[in-house]
Design a protein with these regions (language model features):
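Mature catalytic domains of secreted/periplasmic carbohydrate-active enzymes
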Residues: 1-242
Length: 242
């Protein structure tokens, strides 16, 4: 939403601007955090449903491309779920509930951020002072079984310092003997490196791979709730599995 609303280089989706102005006036995207309370979030219920559905592991989006973190990241001061909005460690609460059910817990983490001024002006400073400390903090705090990175496409793995981070992860971190990672560590790594390959809405045909793979998609045509989607747009359970 923020990208379509704000990105000056994307001269598409003017309906986003019209919708926003009609419903929210001059409010900024950041103002939405005041409405984000998560008052109905019950991680124990989520974990129970995951288990009853037959899931073996859970991956939560800890930070997407807008940079907001669901844990109290020191590098995301005043733009995380503890400092503002719910005032709650959503990532930690879900991790605790999932592990209590003996399920594997994982985190999605976006390497890049759409409008972070440091990322836009000095990528290496962003990687060194924000991205790497955040990923190490996430791993050290919650000891996940899966680290699912994304947003790698702007730069090769060398720029993201992926090799150095993975060396730490698999040699020094608390989860070095148990964690698995996906293949999105640079625009030169997808399908080539990682514990498993990832495709997205069928792109890349990872199912043809001899290596472990995971298909990344929503149940419908969106990754989140979209009130414009009807039931016909949703995949059946059999379609999602096969």
């Amino acid at each position: 939403y923020w990208q379509r609303l704000f990105a000056p280089n994307l001269k598409i989706h003017p309906e986003f601007v019209a919708f926003h102005q009609k419903n929210y006036g001059t409010a900024s995207y950041q103002d939405f955090v005041q409405q984000f309370k998560a008052e109905l979030f019950k991680p124990e219920d989520w974990a129970r449903i995951f288990e009853e559905a037959g899931a073996k592991y859970v991956v939560l989006t800890s930070k997407h491309h807008e940079g907001f973190t669901l844990w109290p990241s020191a590098q995301s001061w005043n733009w995380n779920a503890v400092d503002v909005g719910p005032h709650r460690d959503l990532a930690g609460d879900l991790a605790k509930a999932v592990k209590a059910r003996n399920l594997r817990m994982g985190f999605y983490y976006s390497l890049y951020e759409w409008f972070n001024p440091v990322y836009k002006s000095d990528v290496q400073r962003y990687v060194t002072e924000r991205m790497l400390p955040q990923m190490k903090d996430l791993v050290t705090r919650y000891e996940p079984d899966v680290l699912w990175t994304d947003g790698e496409w702007d730069h090769p793995a060398k720029t993201w310092q992926s090799e150095a981070f993975l060396a730490w992860l698999f040699n020094e971190s608390k989860v070095k003997d148990q964690i698995v990672v996906n293949d999105r560590w640079g625009n030169d790594t997808k399908g080539q490196h990682g514990s498993f390959r990832t495709s997205e809405y069928g792109q890349g045909a990872a199912s043809n791979s001899q290596r472990p793979w995971e298909e990344c998609r929503g149940m419908g045509e969106s990754f989140g709730y979209n009130r414009n989607e009807n039931l016909e747009m949703y995949q059946s359970g059999e379609q999602l599995v096969h």
